[in-house]
């Protein structure tokens, strides 16, 4: 037996058991509208949204966040005022739940943005397409208003906060957007100035910026809140606190911070006329 054959037979060149790790697969989750919101809405369907999530991703598209659910609940409840007939844009959309909800309850236009990562954008487009497929499969005989029968007014775009937003403004017809959604993005403390700048640049006259977040890093809660100071000092936004809701923590970390990490806070930003 040659030396090479001897080494090979001894297992030196055998591949470790975990050498061929299976590729991580996309996940899934779902969201159900609250019955009281459906009952009060002109738009009775869909009542449920099936969402594809990315495989584990450093940009966090693999989770359906509490803030996204709460954002959707609030916009469903207040759709007459905030959504119906409005132009809507979402930053850092992840799976896109709030944007999909806005389309379903009568938004005129919805632009869904996230960091220009191929997996994130593909996943968002998948969820837009799935919204229509789910509608077609379940509601062929539905006679009520049906925005989900046509998703052509929904667009998915890559966007880096603080970068040139002229294309997004052009997509709005040059007017800007009536509602800018920032759902669970203020934990990016280094990006606050860019977030504020882009939100103001894309906002239509009289428009609103809806900010919802959870303090995932409880010890940095004050830095989360600093977003609102910067929004006032750097862009002239006025902030109104709308709610703080007890949910559950997204991550199991320090027991002593569990209470704060369970909270979801909502604010509305407007510019002085």
Swiss-Prot record:
Q: Enumerate the GO terms in the molecular function aspect.
A: N-terminal protein N-methyltransferase activity; protein methyltransferase activity; protein-lysine N-methyltransferase activity
Q: Which residues bind S-adenosyl-L-methionine?
A: 65, 92-94, 114, 161, 183
Q: What is its EC class?
A: transferase
Principal localization? cytoplasm
Where are the coiled-coil regions?
A: none
Q: Mind telling me which PROSITE patterns this protein's record contains?
A: SAM_MT_NNT1
Please state which protein family the record places this protein in: Belongs to the class I-like SAM-binding methyltransferase superfamily. EFM7 family.
Tell me, in a sentence or two, what this protein's role is: S-adenosyl-L-methionine-dependent protein methyltransferase that trimethylates the N-terminal glycine 'Gly-2' of elongation factor 1-alpha, before also catalyzing the mono- and dimethylation of 'Lys-3'.
Q: Where in the cell is it found?
A: Cytoplasm
**Compositional bias ranges of the Basic and acidic residues kind:** 14-24
Q: Which InterPro entries match?
A: EFM7, Methyltransf_16, SAM-dependent_MTases_sf
* Residue numbers spanned by region Disordered: 1-32
Q: Is Methyltransferase tagged as a keyword?
A: yes
Identify the EC number(s). 2.1.1.-
Q: Which organism is it from?
A: Yarrowia lipolytica (strain CLIB 122 / E 150) (Yeast)
- What is the protein named? Protein N-terminal and lysine N-methyltransferase EFM7
What are the alphabetically sorted keywords of the record? Cytoplasm, Methyltransferase, S-adenosyl-L-methionine, Transferase
